[in-house]
């Protein structure tokens, strides 16, 4: 395959899709803030519903290499499903699988990379009732001040990369700087809650949103391309301009959220179909990583043009 062309189209699609995860978090904030009812009931309903499928599917993913060996398959099949799997999993060893499973409470493995979002989601659910108490009583001005402070933190990844690794009190013995309490995905929670009640006309939404999205996309795309053009780059440098909690990604996310608010589906059939899709969404997310590798291989095998391989593979996987 033409590696340079694959990298180009990966950047084109990857940059455009950066708002997806932030949008999910914003929707969570829009729907759940402020939290109603008892905190224990909220935790039981939300976290339990996520925790059990998360653990079961994490175990299945981590057992997969051992199962392929037990069934007599070549280690190559592991790379077919998980192209970035490390050398350790190629051993198809039960002890390696057990090691990965025991590590589930602490982090995801190379075989279940997409589970990073579930750790985040559980953390957000834990935080929501606590954050909600402030959101319920805070004035619009207070919420705006929080979002402003959060906005400043969106520039920190670039400061740390290009200027200095320490800022505002961070040092070798302190990772929690001055604006730490405002940083991270909790800003997206509040942003979703805040924008839910912001009523813009379609004209204003487009006039503001299109330039905002374009600027955010240009920074994301060309920043990523610049990093991948360097002769030597780390994983952190590779992901820098794709960082979800960065200003350029927020600039793409806000217009999409505001535009989505304007969508009014009147067809009852379509509304039911979307509702059913929503019900299945979490399960689809759990299992889809099994299909990404084979889907990409299939698109190449049947001669799908490189510019179309990513969207076609995505449709196959989901």
What is the role of each PLM region?
Residues 1-318:
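Alpha-helical transmembrane segments and their immediate juxtamembrane cytosolic regions
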């Amino acid at each position: 395959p033409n590696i340079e062309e694959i990298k180009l189209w990966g950047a084109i699609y990857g940059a455009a899709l950066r708002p997806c995860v932030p949008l999910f978090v914003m929707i969570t904030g829009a729907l759940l803030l402020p939290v109603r009812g008892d905190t224990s009931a909220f935790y039981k309903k939300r976290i339990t519903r996520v925790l059990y499928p998360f653990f079961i599917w994490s175990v299945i993913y981590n057992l997969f290499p051992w199962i392929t060996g037990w069934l007599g398959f070549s280690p190559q099949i592991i790379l077919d499903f998980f192209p970035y799997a490390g050398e350790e999993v190629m051993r198809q060893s039960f002890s390696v699988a057990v090691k990965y499973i025991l590590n589930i409470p602490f982090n995801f493995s190379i075989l279940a990379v997409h589970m990073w979002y579930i750790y985040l989601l559980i953390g957000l659910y834990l935080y929501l009732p606590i954050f909600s108490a402030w959101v319920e009583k805070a004035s619009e001005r207070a919420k705006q001040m929080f979002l402003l402070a959060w906005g400043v933190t969106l520039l920190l990844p670039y400061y740390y990369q290009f200027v200095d690794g320490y800022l505002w009190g961070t040092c070798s013995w302190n990772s929690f700087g001055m604006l730490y309490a405002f940083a991270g995905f909790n800003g997206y929670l509040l942003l979703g809650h805040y924008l839910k009640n912001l009523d813009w006309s379609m004209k204003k939404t487009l006039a503001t949103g299109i330039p905002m999205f374009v600027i955010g996309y240009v920074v994301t795309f060309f920043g990523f391309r610049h990093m991948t053009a360097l002769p030597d780059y780390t994983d952190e440098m590779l992901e820098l301009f794709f960082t979800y909690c960065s200003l350029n990604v927020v600039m793409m996310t806000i217009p999409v959220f505001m535009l989505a608010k304007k969508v009014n589906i009147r067809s009852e059939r379509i509304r039911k179909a979307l509702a059913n899709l929503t019900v299945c969404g979490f399960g689809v997310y759990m299992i889809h990583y099994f299909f990404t590798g084979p889907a990409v291989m299939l698109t190449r095998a049947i001669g799908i043009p490189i510019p179309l391989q990513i969207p076609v593979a995505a449709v196959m996987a989901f």
